[in-house]
Amino acid sequence: MTRRGRDLEASPQTYARAGGILYLFIIVAALFGEAFVRGGLIVSGDAAATAQRIAASETLFRAGLAGEMLTCVCDVAMAVILYVLLRPVSRNLALLAALWRVTFVAIYGVAKLFEIAALVLLGQDDYLKAFDPRQLHALAYASLRVHSLGYGLSLLFFGFCCALFGTLIRRSGYLPRALGALLEIGGLGYIAFSLAQMLAPAFAARVLFPWLMLPAFPAELGLGLWLLIKGVDVARWEARESAWREGVA
């Protein structure tokens, strides 16, 4: 590896800038998929209306799906980036948080298969003529419901990831304590929503969702912007990294 390559590898600021860009893309793509695509096309409790809207806006639905699959790629990279940035605080806890984030991505990726299943069921292939249109609409809607529940399940792991990364940020000394505290609260909200969705899905969707998700948005947006614009306090990061290396030497 060249000296320049080693310098880039060793620079926490490089990781921070890349993480900021990726995090902001994740937020934009996720909001597009949730608010503009599913929020505009899925009619709660009405399989036929949902099928009609998706058929009429299939390109939009596919764009949302593609964008969210790209967030999976970005989230795996974010797991590595946040591990590198926060390992001076605690190697083991940073690794645990990163693994929780990768687990979230794996479950979320599987859940997206059910959106693909809905598209297949609403397609025009000849073999689908063996089914009544109402059956296809019901099966497609059921697939979308499974996607929603799978997404909720994935948030359990994402919540633990956010809460633990938030704790590490708050204790780091080279990233804002307030952002860390907000991320901890947001992570607890994700955990509470995920568990509530499994125990009382209707209550979780109608009552808890907006309130439990509220702290998470400013925390994640703030972290993305901070990483992109300010980065980390390199001197403090290097001091903690050096202290750890001396301790294990």
How does the language model describe each region?
Residues 1-249:
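Hydrophobic, aromatic-enriched alpha-helical segments typical of multi-pass transmembrane helices
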